[in-house]
Structure formats: structure tokens, C-alpha cells
Amino acid sequence: MGIGFSGLDFGIAIPFCAPRIRAMDTTNPLAVPSASTALVTGATSGIGFSVGRALARLGWTVLVHGRSAERAREAAARMGDVPGGLIPVDADLETRSGVRRLVDQVHRAAPDGLNVLVNNAGAAFDRHGLTVDGVERTVAVNHLAVAGLTRGLESLLKPIGEQRNSPARVIMMTSYLEARARPIQDWALPGEWTQMGAYASSKLANLAYTYALAERWRDRIAVYAVDPGAVRTGFQRSAGGPLHLIGLLGAPLMSSPERPARTVVATATRPAAHPSGSYIRAVRAVDTGRDKPSSVRSRDRAYQRHVYDATQRFLGG
């Protein structure tokens, strides 16, 4: 499943009060009551959980995404008694059908629109495997699902931004490992495969796509990439392989999820401190983070266009 780079040379690039939880009704539209609404994917633990809880504490209505309905409901319950509303939504984002399921749920849950989409869900695996769509699993979750979800929710993001004269915001969680990635030639990642290589390449592709999307949407919808740095979460453990070992050995040097969550929340809620298309690095004790250039490859306009075009072809349009 090539992605159309065959004519290009892209080498290596350096007590408890019950919270206000709204259950999804799959038959009737569910209107959210809050004036400010966000979807946070991967919100059952780690950075996503911290972001969702922080936004809800600010009075936002938060759509809390998990891979299963049970996990999403449990995460919303753990967020506690918050001023905002909590709406559990669920989908497995490895497949296009899973992405469509989440898009449909969000359209029913928030028909009046979203202010913010936080694409936090991510994955890594200890062995090569393909989804039912023929895509390597890491690439499917970390890039193609993000692109498909963002595209499927564009119509919700657009009206809110225009009505408030302040663009809606899409926040992509990236990784500094993108700087060590090989550009993807085939969504299936055939041939030699490593866990770290697949993860880095998926993040490079998504970052390039992020830049391309920011250019196309310009001031209509603001798009940001946030690099959380090395964070102590259950991600490494669940990934297995080298990432699990790195998580065990590096845990004392890693930050808590709350640090990058502060940066994400600041990016989502404060007057724009960064132009759309910014790569923002989470910095200790500085909520708004700071701009830091990403890899040369990710900033190459030709590469961005090719990733965008290849992604659109996969998504169907």
C-alpha cells in the first residue's frame, strides 16, 4: 500500500460526589449544555486524562474518549465532581470503521460544535501487525486515525470558531522522536521493522500533516503540535518491547503527565500565544510552553504536501 513517494528520495531525518456524566444515546441527538466543548482522545489515563479533567474543572464540557465504553465511563467517574459536563465516548481507533464510529458519536453528542479537539490517543506495539485496512497498527493509530478524525469533525470545529471570532483549535500530540524517523513509503511498513522506528515514523508523518493542515486552514481553525517530552505514564508499559524498558529505566527522569497537560490546556483555552502551525514544547513550570523547531524533514514543504495528499487518498478524497 504505497503512499506515492516512489519518485522522491526521503532518507533518514535526524468522600466522593458523582460527576455529571452524560451517557451516549445512540438513537437520539445529545446536545451538550456547556458553552465551551472539547473532545480529548485517549482520555482514560496519562496526559489525556489530565487534560480532560483540567478542562472540566474550568467548566468545559469534555467528551472523554476511551477504547471501550467501560473505560471511558470509568475515566469520567475518576475525574470527580467538576463544574463542566463529562460525556464518555468510545471507539477503537485502529480502523477506519472505528474512526467513523467516533465521528458519528461526537456529531450526536455535540451538534452545536466543538471548540477544541485534542488528538492525544496514541499507540506503540512490540511486533509488526496490520489492521483490517492493511495498515501497520502504529501508523494507523498515530497518524491515519488522527487525520480521519480531524477531517470528520471539521464541520463541527468550523462553525464554533466563526461564531466566536476566535478559531477553534486542534491540538496534535507529537514526539521529539520524529527527528530520528525514516519517512514512510508504504502505510503497511513492509520489510525491516522496529518498534521505535515505526513509532517515530508515524509521528513524523503526523507532524508533517499537521503543518500542511495548518497551512490549508490558516486562521479559520488553529492547528498546533505539542511535544510533551518524556512523560511517566502507562504508555511505555502497555507498549512492551524497547519502550517498556526505556520506561522502566528512565522513569526517574521523566515528568508527570500534569506538566504537558498544563501546556495543552493553556494552548486550548488562552488567547493564542502561538500562531497556528506552531510546534510547542512542554516546559517545566511554564504553562504555555515554548516554540522549538521540529526536524528539518517535518518542515519541508514538499514532504508536507506529499504526506497530506497521500493521507487524503487513503481517507478517500
Please place each PLM-identified region on the residue numbering.
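Active-site Tyr-X3-Lys motif and surrounding loop/helix of classical short-chain dehydrogenase/reductase
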Residues: R101, Q105-R108, D133-A140
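Conserved glycine-rich Rossmann-like NAD(P)H-binding loop of the short-chain dehydrogenase/reductase
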Residues: L58-E74
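A glycine-rich helix->loop->beta "capping" turn
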Residues: P83-G84, Q105-N119, F125-L130
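C-terminal helical subdomain
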Residues: L248-D291, R301-R305, D309, R313
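Rossmann-fold cofactor-recognition segment
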Residues: D81-S97
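Canonical Rossmann dinucleotide-binding motif of NAD(H)/NADP(H)-dependent dehydrogenases/reductases
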Residues: T27-L63
